[in-house]
Each structure stands twice: as structure tokens, then as C-alpha cells.
Amino acid sequence: MNFLPLLGSATLIKGTPRVGHGVIRMDQGNAIKKDVQEFYDNLGWDKSDAGFSDASIYEDLRPVAADYIHRCHQRVKQHLPDSGRYLLDVASGPVQYDEYIAYSAGHERRVCADISLRALVEARKRLGDKGLYVVADVANLPFADDTFDGVVSLHTIYHVPAAEQEKAFNEIHRVLAPERSAVVVYSWGARSPLMLLALMPFLTWSWLSRRLRARADSLGRSDSPTLYGHHYGHGWFAGRKWPFAYNLYTWRSVSPDFTKIYANPRLFGRSLLSVLFRMENAWPRFFGRFGQYPMIVVRKNPPA
């Protein structure tokens, strides 16, 4: 199987790329990037009847939440170009949800870039020849400026080393074609005011659990890999001097922990999430600012 990016397309890959084909620059955040790579190669993209391990660990896969999550996934496509030559999927994983496939329906090719080779093998099974597959570091994308008609990055940048997250946003903007848009789904993590308010008692227990797991790790008793994440808050993002224009909307205002606790299938769980979805649509900027998962729509201005 060939994973070299876009063979025969000299305009897409830089003549002297900063990242070679299939090579990850590990000069910054070396251990973190290696840990993320190993997590997904060894565990995250294990597959079972329930789906991939990544979703089983980090998502609420219960039927009561399915319609809400499905409609949240569909929000991304509203802000992507309907058509074009290349759509870049940054940290594509295996393109695990059907809604994800729809994002590139009107594009000739979907370029999947991921730090995990195993992710790209699985993505190839999903997309076939529609896809082009590149092992790459999101903070050092090996593509020419102004290349892609659209870019999507879902739950990626908060797994990038904290010191490189600003660069990762800038890399997405750099490779985006002028007058086009990119969609980045981020997470404020524990800095989401709404989730702090709703989950405070449970967050205390979670903090204690993490301390116990960290102690077990230090004693060499950890029996499973963990995934790095660093979540900046809205203040950090709003305080950067970005070279791009952007709008901030909600992708989803609540975390899987929230839905698992409050969306009880026997106590109007579906109705609760349906009302929440309508509220998010009515006030997308409010919930993007204060909820769990902002959807950051980056736009690239035409050349001056």
C-alpha cells in the first residue's frame, strides 16, 4: 500500500518539504508526540463490534445520545466548501464516523494526514482511492502554502504539545487556499464554565481518580496507555494575535461525561439532548464560548 502523498502532484508537496514523506519531526514535544503515536497505533484504533477503542473510551455511544451526537457531527459540513479539488483532514484517524465521510463528498480527493500509520491503514479501508494518505505532524504540515480548498481538524490540537498548539492552528491556515475555510473542533476541557458548573461534584472525584492512576503509573503498575491532552481556555485563544479571521461557534456544548450522567434513557434523556441541541443552534456563539467543544471556523483572506 502506498502512503506517499499525492504522487505526481508537484504543486501540493513542497519541493523541499520541512517534513519528509512519512517522517515526523520530533524535535519539540518529542516524548509527547511519541506517546500519542503509540497510543493510537497500539490501542486507540483497535476495533471491536462497538467500534474503535478511541470512541469507546472518549465518547458516549449509548443509543440515547446517538441522535444528538449525529446532528453535532453534521454541523461541521455547514462551514466547509461544498466542492473543490483537495480537502485536508488533519489527524484524520480512520475517518470513523459516516458523517465524517460526507465532509469530502464534493471534493475530488481527501488528503488524510495523521501521526499514526495504523490510522491511515484504517482510513484507506474506508475511503479507498478517494483518499490520499500522509504520515505527518500537525505542527509541521508537509504541504505547500495555499493548497487546500478546505481543511478539517477534529479533536486534534489539544493532543498537540501545549507549546506547539498555536503553531498547529497557523499551519492549518497556511495550507488553506485563499477565500476558503477550515473547521477546527477544539475542547476547552476543564476550562469550560458550563461543564465546570454542571459537573463540579464529579470533577472532584475524577481528579482523585487521576491522582490514584498517576501514583500507580509512578509505581509501574499502569496496565493501559494514556493519551496526552492540554486544553487551553477561551482566554488563551482570544488573546492570540492570529494571522487569520475566524468565527467561534458551538460544535457541542456538553461532554460525554455530562451526557452519561444526565441523559438517562428512562428519564427523558433524548428529550433533554434534543432541547439542548435547539438551544445550541439558537445561541451558537454563547455555547461555543462557554460550552465544552468550540467549532472554530478559520477563513483565509484573498491576497492583498
Predicted regions and their residues:
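Short catalytic micro-motifs in class I SAM-dependent methyltransferases
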Residues: H155-T156
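A conserved beta-strand element that flanks and buttresses the S-adenosyl-L-methionine
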Residues: V152
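Class I SAM-dependent methyltransferase SAM/SAH-binding core
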Residues: L88, G93-N140
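A short glycine-rich, Lys/Arg-flanked "PGG" loop and its adjoining helix->strand segment in the class I
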Residues: E166-P178
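Short alpha-helix
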Residues: D223-F244
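Conserved class I S-adenosyl-L-methionine
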Residues: G20-P81, Q96, Y100, V183-R210
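A C-terminal cap/extension of S-adenosyl-L-methionine-dependent methyltransferases
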Residues: G235, Y246-A304
